């Protein structure tokens, strides 16, 4: 990968940095930058745009930096306001942070869209300064920017989501990324007969827990990675993925990026028809905005749906003339189903 491409920070890391800066300000310190921990063990320095006070509340703002990623949220201001407490960290969403209205997402309906990992990052950053605090996360332009994201389709209203599993946004360049996949697969071929592939950070960790340090992170480029594994002479490919991406693979999509394909709920409906689910279930699922919501609405049929989608994805990917096994994991990295 081009070493000159710039990495960025997630909205979750930006919120954690703002929260730590606000916590420092509550102790009379005006920070120009803060260093915050990440789930991958790195500490990242983030510049602070400004600090200010609202009565007994202390606020700080940082600017999200997306590096060389084409991201509509690049440069957005993330604000955190802190009210010191004796103990415990309470995290809330405010202006410009979306509210979840549908089931099936990592955050339950009715709550602000601050995902579990960013919540932990915010708490850890604040606890480096204070014993306890109430933290309010705000995004002044969040409501306007949300219209340019997938949030409206996912049933998240009124703002953006605070996301990220590592805190770091890797630079995206299609050609560079494909070259990186090929290089990793080539290097590992001497050690392995089976290519171990993972689509995202959660899938990657789950695969590492089973297979160790031989996992290749492939993002959305599933077809390319499987085809390259076949060309390099691997005897098989094992793919770790999550239900949302799996649904696209089950439709025959080899690039699972949202700009390339969708139809995820349709994949769930197909599986339900194969399972002879009643019309009422089909109708309910047809109104889902995400695979997570669709599976929640599918109820007792959810396990069968995942199994059918995994087997269909396996059939499509084996068109590259290599045996493929699918491991489906949830957002905790637990294996829900495998075709092995």
Curated annotation (Swiss-Prot):
Enzyme class: transferase
Pathway: Cofactor biosynthesis; adenosylcobalamin biosynthesis; cob(II)yrinate a,c-diamide from sirohydrochlorin (anaerobic route): step 6/10
Gene3D superfamilies: CbiD-like
Known catalytic reactions: Co-precorrin-5B + S-adenosyl-L-methionine = Co-precorrin-6A + S-adenosyl-L-homocysteine
EC annotation from Swiss-Prot or TrEMBL: 2.1.1.195
Organism domain of life: Archaea
Annotated coiled-coil segments of the chain: none
UniProt similarity note: Belongs to the CbiD family.
Protein name stated in the entry: Cobalt-precorrin-5B C(1)-methyltransferase
Organism: Pyrobaculum aerophilum (strain ATCC 51768 / DSM 7523 / JCM 9630 / CIP 104966 / NBRC 100827 / IM2)
